[in-house]
């Protein structure tokens, strides 16, 4: 049988006015700032008014290491939220906003897929409510003020060779990675090397997603390091006096966006930091607000459990005082086969042996999540080519790891297909076995925190750091940054730094190439391998196929 595309399904959605969606979770019309009929922001005054309520249960959705076969983490997040509502629970989902650049690069975007989507899909993948534009503007204002300060006498004695604040644009544009700024004569300032990152890689984005309120936002913005003097002392954004104006630009962007699923259940879609050099989770303010409004909140973290879940648990939960009741690890039969050595072209053919061979990757993720004291449920995201024998092989393996796997058909059937997963998740939560703990304490030395993640999560023999890196970490400790968590930046495709090393490898080391201080966001980035903070477009970007049809509808975006 033929299946409809995501965009066809989304266009058939019978959306309810956003005021109705807000009313489902107790948000009155006066507390919604509508952007059209189907999306709105939630007012800061409403958010403040619910802070004394008890929290609901937090459910984190993560996955195995991503493969080209696709795992469907967001699709499962949305499907589980709908499934919980279907079985009579008061639930909502919290996911990230899409970055504009990749939507015109690699084909795709979308929030979920099949019959487990959040709408309005096209708007969410384009300008949405303008949050990313506001972040780009705030970041760019600081960039302009730094160069302006240097131009008008450089009172702060900034070393123009050590301006570390790069510019941003929400587009994939490799030509901007390394540039020379201020060319063209004396009137244009002092020429220096500079460069652009994509907006989601901005520290401003990470800060917006970790700040508790506007006061916290301004303090974090002011704490960002933008440059160094000749004596290597840091220059902060507050020294440039940019933090106040940046906060003004971000005032509305701090308010969570509310939209709906295909089944008219509420969803917060807010923020979208890089899952690599940042923590890859939606905003703290959206998650904490949702927990005050619903009994069950389903959220996700970028990439696999070794990156996204580790950062969610060690960074976001630590900073926001959150504790998940259960973690859902998404796996697919196709990905198990790929981890078991099957080529992508052959994934449609039954191969139980390959499924069994590929389960080691899943097993390590289950073990890792359990080490945080949180129970695990495995969601087998169903593909039409899966056979009963292959699904059973995954279930048997998961059972051998002390967890339970549930087949979920949300892509094909919506909440009807995810109801069994929802029932299992509620059953696990009601047992009350969660006893969340972070991987390392705040006062552990920074180098030991990096070792803890590399040994405890990746299962490396050790993290290799040279004297220069160790000295830098010690200096930051002496400057008062020693209690910050670490944010590992490495390939998402493997536990190692080699993206082609699948499964659950052992007997390897993790080379730490450099360390970066994100003082405003509040973490130390450990760069392992090459990090791309400004993507490029592929040979045939999807933008070539995007256009308006005769009816004014967008074609080619999905």
UniProtKB/Swiss-Prot annotation:
Gene3D superfamilies to which the protein is assigned, alphabetical: Domain 2, N(10)-formyltetrahydrofolate synthetase, Formyltetrahydrofolate synthetase, domain 3, P-loop containing nucleotide triphosphate hydrolases
Keywords: ATP-binding, Ligase, Nucleotide-binding, One-carbon metabolism
Pfam families, alphabetized: FTHFS
Cited InterPro entries: Formate_THF_ligase (IPR000559), Formate_THF_ligase_CS (IPR020628), P-loop_NTPase (IPR027417)
Annotated residues for binding of ATP: 67-74
Any one GO MF annotation of this record: ATP binding
EC number in record: 6.3.4.3
Catalytic reaction list: (6S)-5,6,7,8-tetrahydrofolate + formate + ATP = (6R)-10-formyltetrahydrofolate + ADP + phosphate
GO biological process, one term: tetrahydrofolate interconversion
Pathway in which the depicted protein is active: One-carbon metabolism; tetrahydrofolate interconversion
NCBIfam families on file: PRK13505.1
UniProt family annotation: Belongs to the formate--tetrahydrofolate ligase family.
Protein name, entry field: Formate--tetrahydrofolate ligase
């Amino acid at each position: 049988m033929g299946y409809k595309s995501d965009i066809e399904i989304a266009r058939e959605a019978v959306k309810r006015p956003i005021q109705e969606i807000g009313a489902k979770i107790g948000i009155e019309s006066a507390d919604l700032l509508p952007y059209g009929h189907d999306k709105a922001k939630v007012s800061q005054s409403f958010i403040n008014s619910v802070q004394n309520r008890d929290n609901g249960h937090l459910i984190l959705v993560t996955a195995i290491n991503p493969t080209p076969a696709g795992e469907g983490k967001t699709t499962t997040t949305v499907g589980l939220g709908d499934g919980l509502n279907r079985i009579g629970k008061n639930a909502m989902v919290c996911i990230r906003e899409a970055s504009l650049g990749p939507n015109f690069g690699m084909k795709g975007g979308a929030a979920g897929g099949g019959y487990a989507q959040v709408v309005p899909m096209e708007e969410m993948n384009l300008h949405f409510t303008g949050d990313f534009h506001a972040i780009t503007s705030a970041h760019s204002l600081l960039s302009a003020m730094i160069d302006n300060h240097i131009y008008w006498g450089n009172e702060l004695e900034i070393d123009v060779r050590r301006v570390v604040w790069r510019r941003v644009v929400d587009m994939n544009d490799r030509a901007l990675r390394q540039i020379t700024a201020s060319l063209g004569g004396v009137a244009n300032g002092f020429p220096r090397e500079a460069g652009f990152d994509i907006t989601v890689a901005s520290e401003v984005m990470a800060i917006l997603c970790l700040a508790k309120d506007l006061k916290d936002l301004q303090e974090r913005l002011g704490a960002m390091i933008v440059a160094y003097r000749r004596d290597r002392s840091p220059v902060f954004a507050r020294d440039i006096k940019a933090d106040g104006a940046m906060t003004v630009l971000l005032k509305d962007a701090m308010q969570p966006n509310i939209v709906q699923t295909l089944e008219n259940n509420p969803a917060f879609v807010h923020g979208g930091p890089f899952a690599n050099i940042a923590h890859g989770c939606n905003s703290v303010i959206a998650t904490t607000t949702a927990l005050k409004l619903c009994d069950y909140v389903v959220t996700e973290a970028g990439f696999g459990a070794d990156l996204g879940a580790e950062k969610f648990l060690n960074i976001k939960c630590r900073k926001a005082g959150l504790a998940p009741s259960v973690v859902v690890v998404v796996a697919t039969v196709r990905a198990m086969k790929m981890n078991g050595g099957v080529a992508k072209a052959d994934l449609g053919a039954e191969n139980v042996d390959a499924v069994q061979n590929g389960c080691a990757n899943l097993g390590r993720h289950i073990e890792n999540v359990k080490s945080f004291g949180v129970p695990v449920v495995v969601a087998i995201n169903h593909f039409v080519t899966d056979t009963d024998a292959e699904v059973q092989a995954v279930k048997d393996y998961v059972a051998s790891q002390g967890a339970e796997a549930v087949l979920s058909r949300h892509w094909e059937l919506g909440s009807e297909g995810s109801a069994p997963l929802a029932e299992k998740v509620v059953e696990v939560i009601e047992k009350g076995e969660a006893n969340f703990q972070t991987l390392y304490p705040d006062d552990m030395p920074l180098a030991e925190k990096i070792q803890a993640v590399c040994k405890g999560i990746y299962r490396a023999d050790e993290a290799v750091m040279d004297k220069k890196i160790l000295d830098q970490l010690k200096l930051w400790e002496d400057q008062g940054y020693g209690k910050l968590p670490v944010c590992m930046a490495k390939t998402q495709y493997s536990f190692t730094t080699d993206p082609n090393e699948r499964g659950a490898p052992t007997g390897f080391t993790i080379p730490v190439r450099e360390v970066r201080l994100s003082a405003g966001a509040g973490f130390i980035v450990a760069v392992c391998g090459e990090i791309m903070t400004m993507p490029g477009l592929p040979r045939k970007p999807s933008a070539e196929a995007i256009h308006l049809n005769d009816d004014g509808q967008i074609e080619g975006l999905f």
